[in-house]
Amino acid sequence: MYKVSEFSEMTGLSKETLRYYAEVKLIEPAYIDPKNNYRYYDDGSYFLALLLVKLRSFGFTIQEMISVMEDESFAHLEDLLIQKKETIRLQMVELQQKTEEIDAFLASGKELKNK
């Protein structure tokens, strides 16, 4: 069992994030000491936390992560990952278009300046 401070250090999740994730039922302590309300996490919690960190790095929202936790099937996770990948791909296309528009705008400004 790991204390919150140890678990936070191991996973890279802040104590506040762990508290919030427990609030929204994403990851709950394996044990809460009734004497002092200290929260403890176990190895299962550790692997779950690593998954949550990875999903967050992929841009998953809290709601999407809750959806993954509610439906633990790999097929569901795979579907969500494919959807997220497509969303990111579309964002990349949009960003590329914006950079091209900025380049064109800058070029037109330089042309006006040189006249």
Roles of regions detected by a PLM:
Residues 1-58, 62:
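Basic helix-turn-helix/winged-helix DNA-binding cores
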Residues 53, 71-114:
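Short, charged amphipathic alpha-helical surface segments
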